[in-house]
């Protein structure tokens, strides 16, 4: 069962990446990243350093659903949950961004940061192509 769902996710992600490549060439992505970095030059803290220096060592995860359990909380607000994790002692955050299988979104990471989260953030997705990096 687990192998089947993993293969299904990978196959789906390959199709999704192909569509993204057609809609947004890699050269455009590089330009956007350069522009974003110029606007926000501050660096996120190191995840390993944050974990080693913390009392908890906890990487708290934001996930709306899972392939095995279905919807956990369809209406969870990334800003509220991640700030609550930060306030309650998490060392770092893991944010699921896959939409179809985990109910995530790429924008969840920027929304968490814009809401005041200062912890290191792990962008969690299935990477099947260099284009995604």
Predicted regions, residues:
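An N-cap/entry alpha-helix motif that binds or orients negatively charged groups
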Residues: 2-73
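Alpha-helical segments flanking ligand/cofactor-binding loops in enzyme cores
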Residues: 7, 79-83, 110
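Flexible loop residues that form catalytic
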Residues: 14, 98, 126
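Alpha-helix-loop-beta-strand connector modules within alpha/beta enzyme cores
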Residues: 41-59, 103-128
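Glycine-rich beta-to-alpha transition loops that act as phosphate-gripper elements at the mouths
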Residues: 61-65, 72-76, 102, 123-131
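Alpha/beta enzyme core
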Residues: 72-96, 115-116, 131-133
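A mid-sequence interfacial segment
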Residues: 89, 93-106, 110
């Amino acid at each position: 069962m687990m192998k089947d769902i993993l293969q299904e996710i990978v196959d789906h992600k390959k199709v999704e990446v192909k569509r993204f490549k057609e809609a947004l060439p890699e050269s455009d992505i590089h330009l956007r990243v350069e522009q974003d970095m110029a606007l926000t030059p501050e660096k996120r803290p190191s995840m390993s350093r944050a974990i080693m220096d913390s009392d908890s060592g906890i990487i708290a995860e934001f996930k709306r659903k899972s392939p095995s359990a279905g919807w956990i909380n369809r209406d969870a607000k990334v800003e509220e949950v991640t700030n609550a994790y930060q306030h309650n002692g998490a060392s770092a955050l893991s944010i699921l961004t896959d939409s179809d299988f985990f109910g995530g979104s790429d924008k969840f990471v920027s929304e968490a940061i814009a809401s005041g989260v200062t912890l290191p953030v792990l962008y969690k997705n299935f990477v099947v192509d260099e284009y995604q990096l």
